[in-house]
Regions:
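A metal-dependent hydrolase signature that marks the N-terminal structural subdomain at the beginning
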Residues: 1-46, 156, 160-163
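Short amphipathic alpha-helical segments that mediate assembly, nucleic-acid/protein binding
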Residues: 19-23, 110-113, 132-136
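Active-site scaffold of zinc-dependent metalloenzymes
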Residues: 39-83, 93-97
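Second-shell loop/turn segments in exported
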Residues: 10-15, 73-76, 104-106
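Active-site catalytic microenvironments for nucleophilic, acid-base chemistry
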Residues: 93, 97, 118-125
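Catalytic Zn2+-binding segment of zinc metalloproteases
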Residues: 89-106
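Long, well-structured alpha-helical subdomains associated
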Residues: 108, 120-167
Length: 167
C-alpha cells in the first residue's frame, strides 16, 4: 500500500480523543510492538507513513481519532477494536520493512487483506478471538473489494471495445 494512505475505512470514530484515550492508544501500540514508532495527530487519519530525511528513511504509524471503532458498524473494518486496528497498522510497518508491501494503487485492497491476515499471525497472542475474527472479516471484505474493482475495470474495457466496434 502506498504510505500515508489510510487503511481504515469509513465508519470509524471521528470524535476528538481525550488525553486518556490517546494514552491508551499509545500504550496499545507500545504493548504490541515497542520497536515501531507510533504517534498521535488529531488532524490525521490513521496510516503508516514512510519518511525520507537526510539521515535516512524510517517508517512510523501516525494515528488519529479513527484508531477507535465507530458507533455504527458499517463493515468489519469499522468495528475493529483499538487492539486490532493497531495490530493492522503495525503490520503495515513490518510489510514495508520486509519489502513485502504491495505499493501499487491498483493492489491496495489486496495489500490491506494480506496485512489484516498477517496481523493475526504476528500479534495473535495479544488479540482476542473477536479481534481475530474481525481481522479475517476485514480481509475477506478487502478481497471482495479487490475483485469488484477488477471486474469494474474489465467491464469498462469491454464496453470501450464494444463502443469502438459499433462506430
Amino acid at each position: 500500500m502506498p504510505t500515508g494512505r489510510s487503511s481504515l475505512l469509513a465508519g470509524r470514530n471521528k470524535a476528538p480523543l481525550t488525553p486518556d484515550e490517546i494514552r491508551r492508544a499509545v500504550n496499545t501500540f507500545l504493548g504490541l510492538d515497542k520497536n515501531v514508532s507510533a504517534r498521535y495527530d488529531d488532524s490525521s487519519r490513521t496510516a503508516f507513513h514512510e519518511f525520507v530525511e537526510p539521515a535516512g528513511t524510517y517508517g512510523e504509524v501516525v494515528f488519529g481519532p479513527d484508531i477507535y471503532p465507530g458507533s455504527s458498524v458499517i463493515d468489519p473494518n469499522s468495528a475493529l477494536s483499538l487492539d486490532a486496528a493497531a495490530a493492522h497498522e503495525l503490520t503495515h510497518y513490518h510489510r514495508w520493512k520486509d519489502k513485502t508491501a504491495l505499493a501499487s494503487d491498483d493492489l491496495e485492497h489486496l495489500d490491506e487483506a494480506l496485512t489484516s491476515l498477517q496481523a493475526i499471525f504476528r500479534y495473535d497472542r495479544h488479540l482476542s478471538e473477536t479481534d481475530v475474527r474481525l481481522l479475517v472479516a476485514d480481509a475477506v471484505q478487502r478481497l471482495q473489494l479487490f475483485v469488484h474493482q477488477k471486474q469494474t475495470v474489465v467491464a469498462v474495457e469491454e464496453g470501450a471495445e464494444n463502443l469502438g466496434r459499433s462506430e
